[in-house]
Amino acid sequence: MSTETFFALSYTSNHGEQVPLAQFAGQPVLVVNTASKCGFTPQYEGLEQLHETFASRGLVLIGFPCDQFGHQEPGSDTEIEEFCRLNFGVTFPLSTKVEVNGSGTHPVFSFLRKQAETSLGSLIKWNFTKFLVAPDGRTVKRYAPTVTPAEIADDIEALLPHP
């Protein structure tokens, strides 16, 4: 069994900076593969609401734009950020565009898929699949694209410190 945790990984921000996930150790992290031209794109609004509600208590939310499903994220990193900010008021961090399946799968998604394999396998089926990583960096819960951000608020709440 691997001793690797989510917090041993890193990603590249949409501004080109390397972001070590170790800086978020001990905090819950919600990871979402996103797209700007998808039927689920309006979930950006709900994700931003989760970010605004829970960030001050420790939730980290990261969007990972992906163009692997129906070519629904064709823009550049700058265009994606502008679209998210202007249309949905997104303030949570975004990565550079990544792959979530196949030989080019980003290490974050390789880890998450392995930790939260479903009865249907580990492949991500569509945009806006969500992964909630517990503060231990090992426990991961996976949510289908059809699960709205509001529907996972209680699971997030359960991982946050209570005043």
Task: Enumerate the language-model features and the residues they cover.
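Chalcogenol-based redox active-site neighborhoods
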Residues: 1-163
